[in-house]
Structure formats: C-alpha cells, structure tokens
C-alpha cells in the first residue's frame, strides 16, 4: 500500500522530490483507480474530482497524463493544464503524447480568456490526430508575420486561400493530413486544409474553430463567430498578389464528408 508517505510540512521540498519518483513509479498498474487518482491529486495539490475523472478515463495512458500533471507547478499552470485535458476527448486522453500536451501548454495568449481556453490553447480542431503544431508554427512563421496576422486575421485567410491548393483526391478516406504536412506540401484535401488553417490561427493566438454543426471554418471575435471562405477565387481580384493569377484555379465549394456517408472516413479511429 501507500504506507510511509508523510504529508508535506514546512520546507518539505527535498522530501517531496524524493517521493515524486517513487510516486511516479508506483503507477505501474494497467489502469488507474479512482482512489489512486485522488491520492495523486492530493500529493500534487490538484483538483481531486477533475484529476480522478481524467486519469480514470485515460486508461492505459495514465502514466503520460500523470507525468504531465506532475509538471504543473504554479496555480495558473495547474488550472490551465487541467482545462487543456478537459478540452480533448476521452479517446485523446487514451493516446495523447506528453510532447503534444507540453506543446499546447505553451500556447501564445490572446486577450479573451474564454476564447483562449476554447479556441487557442485547445489542440483539438476536428477528427485529426493531435500533433505538437504550436511549436512547429512558432518556428516556421516569423514573429513579425505572426503579429501581422493576429492584428488582421483576414490576411491569414487570404494567405491560406492563395497558397494551399485543394485536391480532394490526395487523401481519400485517410486520417486528415497533419498541419505540418499541409505546410510542407502546400496541397491538401479541403478538410485537412480547414484543420490546417485553424491550427495555424491558434498557434498565432487567433481564436478559430470548425463549426461542429455547419462544418464551416470560423474566426471567433468579440462579436461572435464569423464564417471564412478559404477557397481560392481567382476571378475576384481583392486578394490578388503578384504571380498568383497564373497558378489560380477555380475550386468548387466542397461539402465535408459526413462520417455516415463514408464510414471509411473514420476508419483510423480505434474502438476500445
């Protein structure tokens, strides 16, 4: 059992560090019980109910989740880390990596705290496999560009419409292409392009989402949600830049494939 673990008193920093390793190593069982999860929460001064729900739901991935939780030191990061874990799905909790969680905990801030939690720090956009895309875009896009896009998000809409070519044959029935993959290839199916836009926006602290009901890509501002059109319309000279016209082609508007119409679309999901 857990005998011999003393509660923290006074300057118990060193004792706590020694215990941390033994506590981490004690979680070698397949799944975490409610009791063990609550013990862990008390040790790390985390919200017991939330921690228990999350760790029990994470099943065989509880070591990764506990490792992440153990790194949350300040009150602010404890609140933020638990919020992040509650934004993602139960399936995410079962297979997310530490790298992904750490990446999104370091998201750039935006003014509206609620928008930040839901549409910036939240890594989950749609049905994609979660990746550490925030750090990737931080390196790929200069700070100046990121700030320009944040000041005028429609510039990012225009950039994606002009630079990411849509080819719906390039990813038939597979998992969405990762944001990093779309950045490198500059071509994607429409759904992967939409996820790419939202991921890139979030990495620049621009609140964005794919509307769960309509499937439309939206920027989230103080006045609410605004649909954006990421398709390239070469006949409209508004966003035209040098040399874009020659490459442009008319893209028919694309309806996202509903999972019901196409069961293969979700075939990469596992049931457990």
Sequence positions of predicted segments:
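Loop/turn residues immediately N-terminal
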Residues: 215-216
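N-terminal accessory/pre-domain segments preceding catalytic cores
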Residues: 1-170, 178-182, 192, 202-203, ...
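The substrate-binding groove and active-site-proximal loops of carbohydrate-active enzymes
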Residues: 184-188
């Amino acid at each position: 059992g857990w005998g011999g673990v003393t509660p923290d008193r006074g300057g118990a920093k060193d004792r706590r560090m020694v215990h941390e390793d033994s506590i981490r190593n004690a979680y070698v069982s397949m799944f975490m019980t409610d009791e063990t999860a609550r013990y862990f929460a008390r040790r790390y001064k985390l919200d017991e109910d939330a921690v228990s729900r999350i760790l029990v739901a994470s099943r065989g991935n509880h070591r990764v989740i506990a490792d992440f939780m153990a790194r949350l030191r300040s009150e602010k990061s404890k609140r933020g880390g638990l919020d992040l874990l509650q934004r993602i799905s139960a399936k995410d909790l079962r297979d997310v990596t530490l790298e992904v969680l750490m990446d999104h905990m370091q998201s750039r801030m935006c003014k509206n705290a609620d928008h930040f939690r839901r549409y910036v720090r939240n890594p989950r956009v749609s049905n994609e496999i979660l990746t550490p895309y925030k750090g990737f875009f931080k390196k790929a896009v200069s700070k100046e560009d990121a700030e320009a896009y944040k000041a005028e998000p429609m510039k990012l809409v225009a950039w994606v419409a002009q630079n990411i070519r849509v080819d719906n044959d390039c990813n038939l029935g597979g998992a969405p292409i990762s944001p990093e993959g779309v950045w490198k290839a500059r071509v994607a199916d429409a759904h992967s392009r939409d996820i790419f836009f939202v991921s890139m926006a979030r990495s620049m602290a621009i609140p964005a989402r794919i509307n769960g009901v309509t499937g439309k890509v939206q920027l989230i501002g103080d006045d609410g949600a605004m649909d954006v059109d990421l398709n390239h319309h070469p006949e409209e000279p508004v966003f035209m830049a040098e040399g874009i016209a020659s490459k442009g082609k008319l893209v028919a508007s694309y309806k996202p494939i509903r999972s019901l119409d196409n069961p293969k679309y979700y075939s990469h999901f596992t049931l457990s």
